[in-house]
Amino acid sequence: MAFAKAQKTKAYFKRYQVKFKRRREGKTDYRARIRLINQDKNKYNTPKYRFVVRTSNKDITAQIISASIAGDLVLASAYSHELPQYGLEVGLTNYAAAYCTGLLLARRVLKMLEMDAEYEGNVEATGEDYSVEPADTRRPFRALLDVGLIRTTTGNRVFGALKGALDGGLDIPHSDKRFAGYAKNGQQLDVEVHRKYIFGGHVAAYMRTLMEDEPEKYQSHFSEYIKKGIEADELEGLYKKVHAAIRANPIAKKSDKPQPKAHKRYNLKKLTYDERKARLVERLNALNSAADGDDDDDEDDE
């Protein structure tokens, strides 16, 4: 059979339906989103929260978001660039920093809802899988993990943030199969390996390797660590202090930046309909009063 080119007729273009904008841009997986935001119909106006984690080259963002007709509403958010306030000034995009960011968000949202005393979570980060138990008074805060468009590979930083949120006291349905240290052959999580990743042990091991094998690369690759005076043996203690500082005060600090100055306008401001109407009335009143004044002057002359 000969190859026949598909002809796009007028009927094809008349019936063509354009996909959603964020699908065309490759930003949203609507098949996953609709399953994350659809709420049970007998729950009426109850929001369905998502634990959203996004990573970039210099930052890790974790947010608690609910969907509405007008758009997504952010209940709370935490960023890895906030971690210097808690004592972590380097390595803000690795697995350990993702854990700290998830922990910060969990403690922040529970503090906001006045549930931080009831749900302390897993204070000692042992690397074991942890799920929060319901208290007698209020149920734990529940959210669903939203990973976006990333590949959900074992040991991804998104699951580091998930582990931090779980240890922080949030109720998030999950499996331990994607945490760092899960062995596919043994079908179980290696707790020691996972704990090593939570406390930056993989970074410390790489630092030691470079110091022995490639000192020049170590000087350039870990220049910020060297500048801050942080050594490989100090990383675990550093992360323990950061976790304690986050639990002590998770509230977001307001920025010290001054308010932007109001710029001088050189073009005329466009008036609204009511302002134009009021301005016309003023001009008419002024003209009428001027006309009345001229009439009075004429009468005086006569």
Curated annotation (Swiss-Prot):
One of the GO biological process terms: translation
SUPFAM superfamilies: Translational machinery components
The keyword Transcription regulation belongs to this UniProt entry's keyword annotation: no
Keyword presence, Ribosomal protein: yes
UniProt keyword list: Cytoplasm, Nucleus, Ribonucleoprotein, Ribosomal protein, RNA-binding, rRNA-binding
Major subcellular site: cytoplasm
UniProt name for this protein: Large ribosomal subunit protein uL18
